[in-house]
Protein backbone atom coordinates (compact mmCIF):
# COMPACT_ATOMS: atom_id res chain seq x y z
CA UNK A 1 0.00 0.00 0.00
CA UNK A 2 2.84 2.41 0.87
CA UNK A 3 4.47 1.74 -2.51
CA UNK A 4 1.16 2.41 -4.29
CA UNK A 5 0.81 5.79 -2.51
CA UNK A 6 4.39 6.82 -3.32
CA UNK A 7 4.10 5.89 -7.00
CA UNK A 8 0.70 7.56 -7.20
CA UNK A 9 2.20 10.78 -5.85
CA UNK A 10 4.92 10.65 -8.49
CA UNK A 11 2.31 10.05 -11.20
CA UNK A 12 0.42 13.21 -10.33
CA UNK A 13 3.49 15.46 -10.38
CA UNK A 14 4.09 17.39 -13.57
CA UNK A 15 6.84 15.61 -15.53
CA UNK A 16 9.88 17.47 -16.81
CA UNK A 17 10.43 15.62 -20.06
CA UNK A 18 7.44 13.27 -20.63
CA UNK A 19 4.99 14.54 -23.24
CA UNK A 20 1.44 13.26 -23.50
CA UNK A 21 1.24 10.52 -26.13
CA UNK A 22 -1.86 8.77 -27.49
CA UNK A 23 -1.87 5.04 -28.11
CA UNK A 24 -4.16 2.33 -29.49
CA UNK A 25 -4.16 -1.45 -29.25
CA UNK A 26 -5.92 -4.74 -29.82
CA UNK A 27 -6.06 -7.76 -27.50
CA UNK A 28 -7.38 -11.29 -27.51
CA UNK A 29 -7.44 -14.19 -25.11
CA UNK A 30 -9.58 -16.35 -22.85
CA UNK A 31 -12.64 -15.38 -20.80
CA UNK A 32 -13.65 -17.28 -17.65
CA UNK A 33 -16.99 -16.52 -15.98
CA UNK A 34 -17.68 -17.19 -12.30
CA UNK A 35 -20.21 -19.89 -11.37
CA UNK A 36 -23.04 -19.85 -8.84
CA UNK A 37 -25.29 -22.30 -6.98
CA UNK A 38 -28.04 -22.20 -4.36
CA UNK A 39 -29.86 -24.77 -2.20
CA UNK A 40 -33.11 -24.45 -0.23
CA UNK A 41 -33.85 -27.09 2.42
CA UNK A 42 -36.75 -27.65 4.80
CA UNK A 43 -38.27 -30.65 6.59
CA UNK A 44 -40.34 -31.70 3.57
CA UNK A 45 -38.41 -30.63 0.46
CA UNK A 46 -35.07 -29.77 -1.07
CA UNK A 47 -34.37 -27.60 -4.11
CA UNK A 48 -30.97 -26.94 -5.63
CA UNK A 49 -29.86 -24.97 -8.67
CA UNK A 50 -26.60 -23.97 -10.32
CA UNK A 51 -25.01 -22.75 -13.50
CA UNK A 52 -21.68 -23.87 -14.94
CA UNK A 53 -19.86 -21.65 -17.45
CA UNK A 54 -17.24 -22.80 -19.95
CA UNK A 55 -14.15 -20.86 -20.96
CA UNK A 56 -14.59 -18.88 -24.16
CA UNK A 57 -12.86 -16.46 -26.52
CA UNK A 58 -12.55 -12.75 -25.84
CA UNK A 59 -11.28 -9.87 -28.01
CA UNK A 60 -11.00 -6.15 -27.45
CA UNK A 61 -9.74 -2.80 -28.67
CA UNK A 62 -8.54 0.14 -26.62
CA UNK A 63 -7.41 3.73 -27.03
CA UNK A 64 -5.57 5.74 -24.42
CA UNK A 65 -3.34 8.66 -23.52
CA UNK A 66 -0.05 8.45 -21.64
CA UNK A 67 -0.53 11.52 -19.43
CA UNK A 68 3.01 11.39 -18.06
CA UNK A 69 5.66 8.82 -17.20
CA UNK A 70 3.51 7.00 -14.66
CA UNK A 71 -0.15 7.77 -15.31
CA UNK A 72 -2.41 6.97 -18.30
CA UNK A 73 -6.12 7.02 -19.10
CA UNK A 74 -7.76 4.43 -21.35
CA UNK A 75 -11.06 3.44 -22.93
CA UNK A 76 -11.82 -0.22 -23.79
CA UNK A 77 -14.38 -2.19 -25.75
CA UNK A 78 -14.37 -5.94 -24.98
CA UNK A 79 -16.43 -8.85 -26.30
CA UNK A 80 -16.57 -12.44 -25.06
CA UNK A 81 -18.62 -15.58 -25.70
CA UNK A 82 -19.19 -18.42 -23.21
CA UNK A 83 -21.37 -21.51 -23.01
CA UNK A 84 -23.36 -21.63 -19.76
CA UNK A 85 -25.36 -24.64 -18.50
CA UNK A 86 -28.23 -23.95 -16.07
CA UNK A 87 -29.87 -26.72 -14.02
CA UNK A 88 -32.31 -27.20 -11.16
CA UNK A 89 -33.51 -30.18 -9.11
CA UNK A 90 -36.43 -30.27 -6.66
CA UNK A 91 -37.56 -33.19 -4.49
CA UNK A 92 -40.27 -33.47 -1.84
CA UNK A 93 -41.40 -36.07 0.68
CA UNK A 94 -45.02 -35.39 -0.30
CA UNK A 95 -44.58 -35.81 -4.07
CA UNK A 96 -43.62 -38.75 -6.24
CA UNK A 97 -40.44 -38.31 -8.27
CA UNK A 98 -38.17 -35.34 -8.70
CA UNK A 99 -38.65 -32.22 -10.79
CA UNK A 100 -35.69 -30.98 -12.80
CA UNK A 101 -34.35 -29.16 -15.83
CA UNK A 102 -31.03 -28.62 -17.60
CA UNK A 103 -30.43 -26.26 -20.51
CA UNK A 104 -27.28 -24.90 -22.18
CA UNK A 105 -27.10 -21.28 -23.33
CA UNK A 106 -24.75 -19.35 -25.57
CA UNK A 107 -23.92 -16.14 -23.70
CA UNK A 108 -22.25 -13.02 -25.08
CA UNK A 109 -21.02 -9.94 -23.28
CA UNK A 110 -20.28 -6.49 -24.72
CA UNK A 111 -18.31 -4.31 -22.31
CA UNK A 112 -17.39 -0.61 -22.50
CA UNK A 113 -14.92 0.68 -19.90
CA UNK A 114 -12.96 3.74 -18.86
CA UNK A 115 -9.85 3.15 -16.74
CA UNK A 116 -6.90 4.86 -15.08
CA UNK A 117 -3.52 3.11 -15.36
CA UNK A 118 -0.68 3.51 -12.88
CA UNK A 119 2.74 2.45 -14.19
CA UNK A 120 5.67 1.52 -11.96
CA UNK A 121 8.44 2.43 -14.41
CA UNK A 122 8.89 5.44 -16.76
CA UNK A 123 8.12 5.38 -20.48
CA UNK A 124 11.83 5.11 -21.29
CA UNK A 125 11.90 1.62 -19.77
CA UNK A 126 11.33 -1.35 -22.07
CA UNK A 127 9.45 -3.25 -19.30
CA UNK A 128 6.55 -1.39 -17.65
CA UNK A 129 4.24 -3.19 -15.17
CA UNK A 130 0.96 -1.46 -14.37
CA UNK A 131 -2.24 -1.54 -12.35
CA UNK A 132 -5.59 -0.38 -13.76
CA UNK A 133 -8.92 0.51 -12.15
CA UNK A 134 -12.04 1.59 -13.99
CA UNK A 135 -15.77 1.40 -14.43
CA UNK A 136 -18.25 0.97 -17.25
CA UNK A 137 -21.24 -1.04 -18.45
CA UNK A 138 -21.72 -4.68 -19.44
CA UNK A 139 -24.49 -5.93 -21.74
CA UNK A 140 -25.15 -9.69 -21.53
CA UNK A 141 -27.37 -11.76 -23.82
CA UNK A 142 -28.04 -15.51 -23.57
CA UNK A 143 -29.77 -17.71 -26.14
CA UNK A 144 -30.70 -21.41 -25.65
CA UNK A 145 -28.56 -23.82 -27.63
CA UNK A 146 -31.23 -26.57 -27.46
CA UNK A 147 -34.50 -27.50 -25.79
CA UNK A 148 -32.56 -29.23 -23.01
CA UNK A 149 -34.14 -31.54 -20.43
CA UNK A 150 -37.23 -30.58 -18.43
CA UNK A 151 -39.52 -32.49 -16.07
CA UNK A 152 -41.88 -30.47 -13.90
CA UNK A 153 -39.80 -27.26 -13.96
CA UNK A 154 -39.76 -24.93 -16.97
CA UNK A 155 -36.24 -23.83 -17.94
CA UNK A 156 -35.70 -20.13 -18.69
CA UNK A 157 -35.77 -18.83 -22.24
CA UNK A 158 -33.62 -16.12 -23.80
CA UNK A 159 -32.62 -13.30 -21.49
CA UNK A 160 -30.49 -10.16 -21.51
CA UNK A 161 -29.43 -7.38 -19.14
CA UNK A 162 -27.25 -4.27 -19.02
CA UNK A 163 -25.42 -3.61 -15.75
CA UNK A 164 -22.80 -1.19 -14.36
CA UNK A 165 -19.44 -2.84 -13.76
CA UNK A 166 -16.19 -2.42 -11.85
CA UNK A 167 -12.96 -3.29 -13.65
CA UNK A 168 -9.51 -4.01 -12.20
CA UNK A 169 -6.44 -5.29 -14.03
CA UNK A 170 -2.74 -5.86 -13.68
CA UNK A 171 -0.37 -6.28 -16.57
CA UNK A 172 2.87 -5.41 -18.30
CA UNK A 173 3.88 -3.48 -21.42
CA UNK A 174 7.01 -4.53 -23.32
CA UNK A 175 8.51 -1.90 -25.61
CA UNK A 176 9.46 -3.00 -29.13
CA UNK A 177 10.57 -0.75 -32.03
CA UNK A 178 9.03 2.25 -33.82
CA UNK A 179 6.38 2.87 -31.17
CA UNK A 180 5.12 -0.72 -31.12
CA UNK A 181 4.81 -2.81 -27.99
CA UNK A 182 3.43 -6.04 -26.54
CA UNK A 183 0.88 -6.09 -23.71
CA UNK A 184 -0.26 -8.84 -21.35
CA UNK A 185 -2.91 -8.28 -18.69
CA UNK A 186 -5.05 -10.26 -16.29
CA UNK A 187 -8.35 -8.48 -15.64
CA UNK A 188 -11.52 -8.94 -13.62
CA UNK A 189 -14.80 -7.22 -14.48
CA UNK A 190 -17.52 -7.55 -11.80
CA UNK A 191 -21.23 -6.74 -12.00
CA UNK A 192 -24.55 -7.90 -10.60
CA UNK A 193 -25.49 -11.32 -11.93
CA UNK A 194 -28.34 -11.67 -14.48
CA UNK A 195 -27.56 -15.39 -14.91
CA UNK A 196 -28.12 -16.19 -11.23
CA UNK A 197 -31.53 -14.54 -11.38
CA UNK A 198 -32.63 -17.14 -13.94
CA UNK A 199 -32.00 -20.03 -11.54
CA UNK A 200 -34.74 -21.78 -9.53
CA UNK A 201 -34.08 -20.98 -6.69
CA UNK A 202 -32.14 -17.82 -7.65
CA UNK A 203 -28.44 -17.51 -6.82
CA UNK A 204 -26.88 -14.58 -5.02
CA UNK A 205 -23.27 -14.19 -6.19
CA UNK A 206 -21.89 -11.36 -8.29
CA UNK A 207 -20.88 -12.17 -11.87
CA UNK A 208 -17.12 -11.95 -12.40
CA UNK A 209 -15.47 -12.14 -15.80
CA UNK A 210 -11.78 -13.07 -15.61
CA UNK A 211 -9.75 -12.38 -18.75
CA UNK A 212 -6.23 -13.36 -19.78
CA UNK A 213 -5.38 -10.93 -22.58
CA UNK A 214 -2.48 -10.73 -25.03
CA UNK A 215 -2.08 -7.99 -27.61
CA UNK A 216 -0.14 -5.24 -29.34
CA UNK A 217 0.07 -1.51 -28.62
CA UNK A 218 1.00 1.36 -30.95
CA UNK A 219 2.16 4.69 -29.47
CA UNK A 220 2.10 7.86 -31.58
List each model region and its residues:
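Gram-negative (and chloroplast) outer-membrane scaffold detector with strong preference
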Residues: 19-22, 32, 62-149, 209-220
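Cleavable N-terminal export/targeting peptides
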Residues: 1-20
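Hydrophobic alpha-helical segments of small multi-pass membrane proteins
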Residues: 112-114, 131-137, 162-172, 188
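Outer-membrane beta-barrel translocator domains and adjoining extracellular loop/strand segments
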Residues: 36-44, 85-92, 141-152, 194-201
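Predominantly the C-terminal beta-signal and adjacent terminal strand-loop region
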Residues: 82-86, 95, 176-220
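Short sequence motifs at beta-strands and strand-loop junctions characteristic
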Residues: 51-57, 106-111, 158-165, 206-208
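Extracellular loop and loop/strand-boundary signature of outer-membrane beta-barrel proteins
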Residues: 44-50, 97-105, 151-158, 198-204
